[in-house]
Amino acid sequence: MTLQVMRRVGAMAILVMGAVHLQQYLGDYQFIPTIGPLFGLNAIGSAVIALGLMLPLERWLRERRGEVAVGLLALGGVAVALGALVSLYIAETGTLFGFSEGTLDTVMWVAIVSEAVAVVLLAPVAVANLVGVGAAPGAARS
């Protein structure tokens, strides 16, 4: 699988994750203190990251700046997905900001799978695009 395919599929996984969080937020989660706003922020952040990963940033920005932008967006996607996975685990096994999940519904499994796919696919994209960021211009990338 090429990095370009990983980037696009990872972006779709982030979009699915955000859609699940938006659906939950628009349901009862918007009324849960702290957790509700975090679900809303996850949905917004996921949409921004997914859109950024789908855009031809390398074409719009100078080549290296585009690569760095893609790397940072991919890293952001990994961070949001890992944060959501860890938060769900904490809420399932204990409490998170006073909130605990009761059971793993189908929608939660959709979120878990999309978050895991996003991490697996976007981590290599982030690494590949951010390697040598501090190197001098024109220096060979390994």
Annotate each language-model stretch with its function.
Residues 1-142:
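Membrane-interface extramembranous regions
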